[in-house]
Amino acid sequence: MEERYGKLAIANLLTSIWFGDWKRYEEIMEDVPEPLQQELSFHSFYKRDEVQLWHDNHFFIPGDHFVSPYFSSYPTNSGDEEDRRKDLLCLIGLYEKTGFYYPLEQDRFPDHFGSLTAFLSSVMKEEIEAEQEGDSQYLEQLEELEADVLHQYIQPVIRPLLQQAEMKVKHPFFKEFLRFYADMMENGWVEAAE
């Protein structure tokens, strides 16, 4: 149960960064004990005004420093543009099927990395409830859903995202954040689930 709460906190933190919700980021970090804050390498570079400006430059305003925050912008091993379009439609269907309307409420596209991590947060909340209620069958379904989202939508585009960011991301907060995000989604998330 403790791991689920930890993953939920991390997913909420990642979501706040992807969406540039600095008020929420600061609220979350206030609750993080100092020793754990030091493990979040990006946090030592946090200066709200700078980070807010560079967030817009990196993830919102197209230009020299722009890095797309949308999974459908990146090629995957298997795919052409048609495959990415199908993946996007499947993701939208998944959101509708589970009643996840956060991207619409936030006026964001469903394939935004912030939307994906917000969805993982939503799944984590459901997992916590299922575990508390002793509903092992529902918990297993949720764990499979969580793994599917990671394997189908996030992990295949981590390397292309980092390659694009390598030359464009200048601010150390975001350099460290992207490294942390990649490591968490490729390794840490899975380890925390086990």
Task: Please provide the spans of the model-predicted regions.
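Surface/interface-facing alpha-helical segments and adjacent flexible terminal/loop regions used
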Residues: 1-194
